[in-house]
């Protein structure tokens, strides 16, 4: 049996019009070939689908059942084609994004996440908070489509684009003598009790900020080690020490703490969008990348 979709469409048109001439006009074909195709369809099925007289065309019991089934099949095919097209256009599917805790504080990132969800509601956006080090392996393996992470050494198999190049800022308790200065030097910060990341956490900011200090031959006196940037902010506001974080965290404003610019011009950090170089990017991932890069312009 070799029934094609066009046979089903021909039959549905005749069954709905109950007139070969009108059905042929609807299908934009001539009537004789349409009659031949319906006869061939009946022969393949082995049942009469239409009762024909000189004056009318009626559905047989088999024809009524075949009409219902044909409509369902054609609807399923149309739905499947529409879903495939939406996936091809990046309007459906799944997008897996890793991000560091600082990424949502960057305006372009938060705006892009919001706009992407609005513009592509049928794309399942799976976000995973992971530090910089934790994202590398899933990106290489392709279990993450892309990652938002701090500048770090990347393997050759990963590509990146700079999302933001931002200053590092000092965080100082509000009643500290340095809190009201127009800026503060790294040397001044290195003399104070320092609240910082646990080295085992694997955040890119740990290497970034300590590397900056080392370039100036400074070693901060780390008195508190924690796992999250928000914990650092909380402990500084509680007066347990000073710290350094990227300027994007300035969106967190607490009365007990001041954000003070750092005097050294190279006190900067970058947020990167990273994706696998050798894995084909899904249309949804390409759309997200375009949205994010456009938000930076």
Curated annotation (Swiss-Prot):
Example of a GO biological process term: regulation of DNA-templated transcription
Pfam families noted in UniProt: HTH_1, LysR_substrate
GO annotation, cellular component aspect: protein-DNA complex
Keyword Metal-binding among UniProt keywords: no
Name of the protein in question: Uncharacterized HTH-type transcriptional regulator YnfL
Recorded family membership: Belongs to the LysR transcriptional regulatory family.
Keyword set includes DNA-binding: yes
PROSITE patterns on file: HTH_LYSR
Keyword tags: DNA-binding, Transcription, Transcription regulation
InterPro entries registered for this protein in UniProt: LysR_subst-bd (IPR005119), Tscrpt_reg_HTH_LysR (IPR000847), WH-like_DNA-bd_sf (IPR036388), WH_DNA-bd_sf (IPR036390)
Ranges annotated as DNA-binding: 20-40
Domain HTH lysR-type: 1-60
Species, as recorded: Escherichia coli (strain K12)
Gene Ontology MF annotations: DNA binding; DNA-binding transcription factor activity
């Amino acid at each position: 049996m070799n029934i094609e979709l066009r046979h089903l469409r021909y039959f549905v048109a005749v069954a709905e019009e109950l007139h070969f001439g009108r059905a042929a006009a609807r299908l934009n074909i001539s009537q004789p070939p349409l009659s031949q195709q319906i006869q061939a369809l009946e022969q393949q099925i082995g049942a009469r689908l239409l009762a024909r007289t000189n004056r009318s065309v009626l559905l047989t019991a088999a024809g009524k059942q075949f009409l219902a089934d044909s409509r369902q099949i054609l609807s399923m095919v149309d739905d499947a084609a529409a879903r495939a097209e939406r996936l091809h256009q990046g309007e459906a599917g799944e997008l897996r994004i890793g991000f560091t805790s600082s990424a949502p504080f960057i305006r372009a990132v938060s705006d892009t996440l919001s706009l992407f969800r609005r513009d592509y509601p049928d794309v399942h956006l799976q976000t995973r908070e992971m530090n910089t080090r934790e994202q590398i392996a899933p990106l290489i393996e392709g279990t993450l489509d892309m990652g938002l992470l701090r500048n770090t050494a990347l393997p050759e198999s990963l590509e990146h684009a700079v999302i933001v190049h931002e200053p590092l800022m000092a965080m100082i308790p509000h009643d500290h003598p340095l809190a009201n200065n127009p800026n503060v030097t790294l040397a001044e910060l290195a003399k104070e009790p320092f609240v910082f990341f646990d080295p085992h956490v694997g955040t890119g900011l740990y290497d970034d900020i300590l590397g900056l200090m080392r370039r100036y031959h400074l070693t901060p006196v780390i008195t508190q080690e924690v796992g999250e940037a928000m914990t650092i902010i909380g402990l500084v506001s509680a007066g347990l020490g000073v710290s350094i974080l990227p300027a994007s965290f300035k969106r967190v404003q607490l009365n007990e703490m001041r954000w003070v610019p750092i005097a050294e011009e190279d006190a900067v950090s970058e947020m990167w969008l990273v994706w696998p170089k050798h894995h084909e990017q899904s249309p949804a991932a390409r759309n997200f990348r375009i949205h994010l890069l456009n938000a930076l312009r």
